[in-house]
Amino acid sequence: MIVAVGIDVVLVERFTRALARTPLLADRLFTEAERYTRSGNPRSPESLAARFAAKEAVAKALGAPAGLSWHDCEIVPDPDGRPWLTVSGTVAAAAVERGASRWHLSLSHDGGIASAMVVAER
């Protein structure tokens, strides 16, 4: 049963400027596994913007409670290389309160816009 849906869009150029303006922002928003590909290459600005949109979408699905940690919502590749959403800590606790135990994630980026949609299920 679906308990929540969240969606968010990010302007890639604006996000890229924010990362350039605030050097530690990427470390604050993303885990190392999110910032780099499996082969150790830095992720593209489009990929990071889509992952940030996913984190925002998760927060929206949970009702945007205060105190969520960005690192407690992680988008990493599954064994086939597709983006996979994992939650822990503050985000997992908020998910339990909301009755969410399974997540579905879709990421996209095109035309300078990154987007993400999440569906939370019981």
UniProtKB/Swiss-Prot annotation:
GO molecular function, one term: holo-[acyl-carrier-protein] synthase activity
Protein name according to UniProt: Holo-[acyl-carrier-protein] synthase
GO biological process terms, semicolon-separated: fatty acid biosynthetic process
InterPro entries: 4-PPantetheinyl_Trfase_dom, 4-PPantetheinyl_Trfase_dom_sf, ACPS, Ppantetheine-prot_Trfase_dom
UniProt GO cellular component terms: cytoplasm
Family affiliation: Belongs to the P-Pant transferase superfamily. AcpS family.
NCBIfam families in the cross-refs: acpS, pantethn_trn, PRK00070.3-2
Keyword Transferase: yes
Described function: Transfers the 4'-phosphopantetheine moiety from coenzyme A to a Ser of acyl-carrier-protein.
